[in-house]
Amino acid sequence: MLASSAARRQRQGPARLYAYAFLLALSGFCLVPFLWPLLASVDGHAGLFLRAPDLTLHNFHKVVSDPTYRRLALNSFIIAGGATIVVLAASALGGYALSRFSFPGRRVFMFGVLFTRMIPATATIVPLYIIEGDLSLTDTYQGVILAIAAQQLPLALWLMKGFFDTVPASLEEASWIDGLSRFGSAIRIVAPLAAPGVGVTALFTFIEAWGDFLTPLILLSGSPDKTPFSIGLFRAFIAFNLVDWGLLAVLAIVYTIPAVALYFLVRRYLLRATMTGGLAGE
């Protein structure tokens, strides 16, 4: 039996080596698109094709020193951060209610909420613009934040409900016996155990809001000083009918940093929250 196991491992050795080599080559192929902006960002004469770069930090200096790009980044943080806060608050309340209370038509309501995710944004942007125009919300941060939050709320509601479902109701009932109110048990018992759901929802919402292009393009068409980074990146691509590839590469790198940083931050937080929730459950 030991001999057969050794022979099987010996046969699997070359196959495993080939599999790792294939995965390594595939990973390198997938990383090539990320190599271009890194090289073009430090190239004084960057072009569309990769070549030995003429090393310079002029493109980074241009972005950092120009107040226009700092304003674009600030606008993106205001819009994405505001939408994330609104979605977290609404989805936490709605997800808890859908998880803990039964009412007629709950399943129909949940699937109806999910169905709205199938409607493309291009089909709703015109009526959305008309509604926000009637409410005097066009060309305002509030209008864009509410619009993006409404688009992201269905998925967030499903996520939060799923995480609340993983928290046993018996823990809440035990806290009621100890004198806590429903609100108190939701804050002190349920919320810490459902913390991974908050992190996942915040991550998805922020990334979607940060990368949203169509909604701010239409709703902020009359206020260029409030446009986010996504629109600024597009305008840098078509400015003067001449593409500054080095500047575009730097903007693309800067544009991705917040989402990547938030991912790693939330990833560590999720690990800690999951361990804490497991210990509390014991």
Residue ranges of predicted features:
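Short, Lys/Arg-rich, polar N-terminal cytosolic tail immediately upstream
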Residues: 1-12
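A structural signal for multi-pass alpha-helical bundles of membrane permease subunits
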Residues: 16-282
